């Protein structure tokens, strides 16, 4: 079986000037064909200086297969590169958020969403064709107000496929076990979806640099369940972001294992607030 995202890599980590015009036009046409006047789902991208990643993300979204009517919108966090131009070239309605942070950008997308459900999308991430449908299927279940999923990293010269598989398998197991009692700790913004009305009611924190999505999940718990989806058709693929913050993949693995062991008690207890 081939790698589903392989063709998108030809425009990933590349400036927009190098993007084939045929690809841009294909993405534009396919996205136009997906946009609904009466969406059930809002697919909301945020991006800050994501010129080298956004087209690949949009290309993957243009090939979504979804039984639910949807809209795709974007939020440009006042980028200094050609991020906004890519939204325009691909025909994606977008909004400019001048206050910088993921929280402000997510909130901007939420405020403009028309769908019953809001799907977080990160511009440096690619999503499989059935991603949105699978997430919404979970949200449609009685009592579910939010859904989180899993993600993989793109293998490269510094990160072997097998090394990544070991790292991801260990991380996935921990996130899954954690999701039973403390699902908010298993939520990551790039693979998170939720009820639009309830998120507007709780709001999204804008006073923190990271963790606004987990905090939103914590607030949503008062209304129902945060489900955890492990299906491969809901598994996104992304670059390295914070996984490289601790140096090598092995060092990242050690740091995360140590943190997991220190917090192992949390796997068995619920928590209503964090300080």
Feature names for model-found ranges:
Residues 40-42, 71, 215:
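Cell-envelope/extracellular polymer assembly enzymes that use nucleotide-activated donors
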């Amino acid at each position: 079986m081939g790698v589903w995202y392989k063709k998108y890599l030809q425009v990933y980590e590349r400036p927009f000037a190098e993007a084939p015009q045929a690809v841009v036009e294909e993405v534009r046409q396919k996205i136009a064909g997906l946009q609904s006047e009466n969406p059930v789902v809002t697919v909301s991208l945020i991006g800050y200086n994501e010129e080298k990643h956004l087209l690949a993300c949009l290309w993957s979204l243009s090939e979504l297969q979804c039984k639910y009517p949807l809209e795709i919108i974007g939020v440009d966090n006042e980028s200094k590169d050609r991020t906004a131009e890519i939204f325009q070239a691909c025909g994606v309605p977008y909004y400019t958020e001048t206050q910088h942070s993921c929280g402000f950008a997510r909130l901007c997308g939420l405020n403009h969403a028309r769908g019953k459900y809001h799907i977080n999308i990160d511009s440096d991430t690619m999503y499989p064709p059935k991603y949105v449908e699978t997430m919404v299927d979970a949200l449609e279940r009685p009592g579910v107000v939010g859904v989180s999923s899993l993600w993989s990293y793109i293998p490269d010269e510094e990160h072997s496929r097998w090394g990544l598989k070991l790292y991801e398998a260990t991380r996935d197991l921990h996130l899954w076990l954690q999701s039973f009692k403390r699902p908010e700790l298993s939520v990551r913004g790039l693979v998170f979806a939720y009820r639009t009305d309830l998120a507007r009611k709780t709001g999204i924190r804008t006073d923190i640099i990271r963790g606004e999505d987990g905090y939103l999940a914590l607030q949503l718990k008062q209304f129902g369940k945060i489900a955890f989806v492990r299906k491969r058709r809901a598994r996104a693929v992304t670059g390295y972001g914070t996984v490289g913050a601790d140096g090598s993949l092995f060092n990242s693995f050690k740091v995360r294992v140590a943190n997991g062991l220190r917090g192992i008690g949390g796997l068995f207890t619920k928590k209503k607030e964090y300080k």
